[in-house]
């Protein structure tokens, strides 16, 4: 008599994987919190996720350094933390206005932070910008802006901080670097190519840092949030049919079922860093997207293309940019110039 075999449906496998992942995450996030008194530097710390992280760490007894471009927003952030009674003392926070896309200013921020508090325990690279619009309407300058803020600012602060993070006193806890990347660094979202390119770069840098520094006393956590209700749409740059682009992005960024609150994200990040996690993905949709793109990259690209075709605005013909550009080639550098014409297809 033959034994009957019960077929396992792919959905059952997926459900099992999700349940197992949730169980592992629960165990990892249930470990004790980090000890108080840490010195935490947060870039982009004046609003959104940066401010939520500042509040979470302040409530744990950390001393804060907040860096951002706008000094008025930094002052407002400090007042918010004081009003919410998150800070134990006004002396526990240092505000450093700076443009971190400038390596010299990033070094100045690190030096002033160490001079003021004596050390840095945790560096959180959170500063970022968003550029939204179809590729036909995105100038090269948009990619340069995104790379400068989303990638090079983190690179500048990391390089400036590394000597301090590596030079720990015997018996001290490991230092930590936290890179706030994005699911956009795992999954190429259409109409956000400057953002996607910069976040892919940051994910690669962050994962490589973890490999190199894990056994040198510096833990690196790569954070890949999905959509969050940060209010970032108010500060995003839109190209193409700007009203339509703003509409779809704002709707997606503020739909509760698709997004996470910044407080929830800050709590997840705090726990991940305290527990030495190498990487976390925030929101179930982002977790699922990251795994699907890893298992079926071609299928994911077809689905993304379909969404672009059916759901997103068409390019603005009036604002189409000249896709060709010129390169001037020398022995030492490659810069924009007029000697060689490169056109699409070459």
Show which residues each predicted segment covers:
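Conserved glycine-rich Rossmann-like NAD(P)H-binding loop of the short-chain dehydrogenase/reductase
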Residues: 60-77
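Conserved glycine-rich cofactor-binding loop
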Residues: 46-47
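The beta1-alpha1 cofactor-binding region of Rossmann-like NAD(H)/NADP(H)-dependent oxidoreductases
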Residues: 72, 97-108, 140
């Amino acid at each position: 008599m033959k034994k009957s075999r019960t077929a396992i449906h792919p959905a059952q496998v997926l459900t099992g994987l999700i349940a197992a992942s949730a169980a592992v995450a629960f165990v990892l996030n249930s470990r004790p919190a980090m000890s108080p008194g840490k010195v935490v530097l947060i870039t982009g710390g004046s609003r959104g996720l940066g401010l939520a992280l500042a509040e979470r760490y302040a409530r744990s007894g950390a001393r804060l350094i907040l860096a951002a471009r706008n000094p008025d927003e930094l002052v407002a952030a400090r007042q918010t933390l004081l009003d919410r009674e998150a800070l134990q003392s006004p002396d526990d926070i240092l505000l450093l206005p700076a443009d971190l896309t400038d390596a010299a200013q990033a070094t100045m921020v690190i030096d002033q932070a160490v001079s003021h508090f004596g050390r840095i325990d945790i560096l959180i690279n959170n500063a970022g910008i968003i550029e939204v619009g179809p590729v036909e309407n995105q100038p090269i300058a948009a990619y340069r802006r995104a790379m400068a803020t989303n990638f090079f600012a983190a690179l500048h602060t990391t390089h400036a901080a590394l000597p301090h993070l590596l030079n720990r006193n015997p018996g001290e806890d490991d230092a930590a670097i936290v890179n706030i990347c994005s699911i956009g660094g795992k999954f190429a979202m259409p109409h956000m190519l400057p953002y996607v390119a910069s976040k892919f770069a940051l994910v690669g840098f962050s994962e490589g840092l973890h490999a190199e520094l894990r056994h040198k006393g510096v833990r690196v956590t790569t954070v890949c949030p999905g959509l969050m209700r940060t209010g970032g749409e108010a500060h995003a740059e839109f190209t193409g049919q700007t009203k339509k682009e703003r509409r779809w992005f704002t709707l997606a960024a503020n739909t509760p079922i698709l997004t996470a609150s910044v407080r929830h994200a800050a709590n997840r990040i705090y726990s991940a860093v305290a527990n030495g996690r190498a990487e976390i993905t925030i929101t179930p949709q982002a977790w699922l997207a990251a795994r699907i793109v890893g298992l079926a990259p071609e299928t994911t690209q077809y689905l993304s293309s379909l969404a672009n075709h059916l759901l997103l605005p068409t390019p603005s013909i009036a604002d189409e940019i000249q896709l060709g550009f010129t390169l001037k080639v020398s022995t030492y550098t490659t810069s924009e110039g007029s000697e060689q014409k490169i056109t699409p297809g070459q």
